[in-house]
Curated annotation (Swiss-Prot):
EC number, UniProt record: 5.4.2.10
Annotated protein name in UniProt: Phosphoglucosamine mutase
Superkingdom: Bacteria
Record's function text: Catalyzes the conversion of glucosamine-6-phosphate to glucosamine-1-phosphate.
Listed cofactors: Mg(2+)
């Protein structure tokens, strides 16, 4: 059965609009509770975290009601980064972890994603089973077996200590001036605290959440504010997180950006030189720049590509026994340190390289020359499928013919928003602009 509710990163949409309603969240909590409580002989628990969106309170309450109605005990973490939920699911011996977040999306959106007891995101098959339970009659627990809910006060502290342990024990950040942009999101407390405890001079940005300003003109998808802060304060480096802190972008001392591809190139090179990169292999998605692939090939390193979504990167890494992967968008996965993308830990690894090598951020952030890339997003309405239109298929075929042997074209629907993403890469920038423009025009006409 194909998934209908779950996308590439859980369930996501506009709050109080189907599917992201309180009613759905209650039933989803009950369905997930029934799925994870199949062993009736043992006590069961779920940890629930959230980012700083106003609707998080509503979904937290609804999910709690759903889980407790099936007999599961709920541990509420409050606002906390997504990777912390994955960590605490493991360390607190929970059956399941839940993060309420729409990641980098605007404040009006929200989402629900699940982690298994091992701290990894659920497989497609597990999500399909939960959807099957959701579609039927969900049997509640008997009154004496209803679950309890409890707030956990030290979740942030546990994650802070774990994050610091990923930073080399013999290093400090003394003398380093660091701008950290927390996107008014889940890391607004923990990221500045970690950097300060490691000795950095911290300049916080995006640390005043009000429920409606998450990701607004800040964070990894809008790094201009942090870039201005880096330059105006004379900072050495900037770290830009997204709303749930599972992705990161780095700014050098000039306010210039390094994306996930450049970070993966740096880490892969260093790890390979130290004998730490398993099988000399990096895992990335189809969105990563061709320049990264060429760079790794020249070094004798391998690149394995997956579908878009850090969960697919992680699945490939686990299957192949590899320990480094990520996405151009800034999800960096280091399986030696955690089970999912972690923006703060990736930022710490970049700072460690600065300190160990005695080099500036600008010297480290640019490992390879990118092949010119253009990405355009086209929004479509409910029930529309512009990629099924004959005119769009014809435009795609024509574009692929033009790019044959010169570049590549990737057309896909977003798994988290109603968008068609049109991405192309080509050394000939005039051809690149023309090809993308023609495909975008065809998609827009079909919407």
């Amino acid at each position: 059965m194909a998934r209908k509710l779950f996308g590439t990163d859980g369930v996501r949409g506009t709050a109080n609009t189907a599917p992201m309603t309180a009613e759905m969240a209650l039933r989803l909590g009950a369905a997930a509770g029934r799925y994870f409580r199949r062993d009736q002989s043992a006590a069961h628990r779920v940890v629930i975290g959230k980012d700083t969106r106003l609707s998080g309170y509503m979904f937290e309450t609804a999910l709690t009601a759903g889980f407790t109605s099936t007999g599961m005990n709920v541990l509420l973490l409050g606002p906390i980064p997504t990777p912390a939920v994955a960590l605490l699911t493991q360390s607190m011996r929970a059956d399941v972890g839940v993060m309420i977040s729409a990641s980098h999306n605007p404040a009006d959106d929200n989402g629900i994603k699940f982690f298994g007891p091992d701290g990894y995101k659920l497989s497609d098959a597990a999500e399909e089973e939960i959807e099957e339970i959701l579609a039927g009659d969900i049997r509640p627990a008997q009154a004496p077996n209803i679950g309890r809910a409890k707030r956990i006060d030290d979740g942030l502290g546990r994650y802070i200590e774990r994050a610091k342990r990923t930073f080399p024990a013999h290093l400090r950040l003394d003398g380093l001036k660091v701008v950290v942009d927390c996107a008014n999101g889940a890391a607004y407390k923990v990221a500045p605290a970690v950097l300060w405890e490691l000795g950095a001079d911290v300049i916080p940005v995006g640390v005043s959440p009000n429920g409606r300003n998450i990701n607004r003109d800040c964070g990894s998808t809008a790094p201009q504010t942090a870039a201005e802060a880096v330059v105006s304060h004379g900072a050495d480096v900037g770290i830009c997180l997204d709303g749930d802190a599972d992705r990161v972008m780095i700014l050098d001392e000039n306010g210039e950006l390094a994306d996930g591809d450049q970070l993966m190139a740096l880490f892969a090179t260093r790890w390979a030189a130290q004998g730490l990169l398993r099988d000399n292999t990096l895992v990335a998605t189809v969105m990563s720049n061709l320049g990264l692939e060429y760079y790794l090939n020249d070094l004798g390193l391998k690149l394995v590509r997956t579908a878009v979504g850090d969960r697919y990167v992680v699945e490939a890494m686990r299957k192949g026994g590899w320990n480094l992967g990520g996405e151009q968008s800034g999800h960096i996965v280091m399986l030696d340190h955690g089970t999912t993308g972690d923006g703060l830990m990736a930022g710490l690894q970049f700072l460690a390289e600065m300190v160990q090598q005695g080099r500036s951020a600008s010297e480290l952030k640019h490992s390879f020359t990118t092949v010119p890339q253009r990405l355009e997003n086209v929004r479509f309405g409910a029930g529309q499928d512009p990629l099924a239109a004959a005119s769009v298929k014809s435009a795609i075929a024509a574009a692929e013919a033009q790019l044959s042997g010169k570049g590549r074209l990737l057309i896909r629907k977003s798994g988290t928003e109603p968008l068609v993403r049109v991405m192309a890469e080509c050394e000939d920038e005039a051809m690149l602009t023309s090809v993308v423009g023609e495909v975008v025009a065809a998609v827009e006409a079909a919407c």
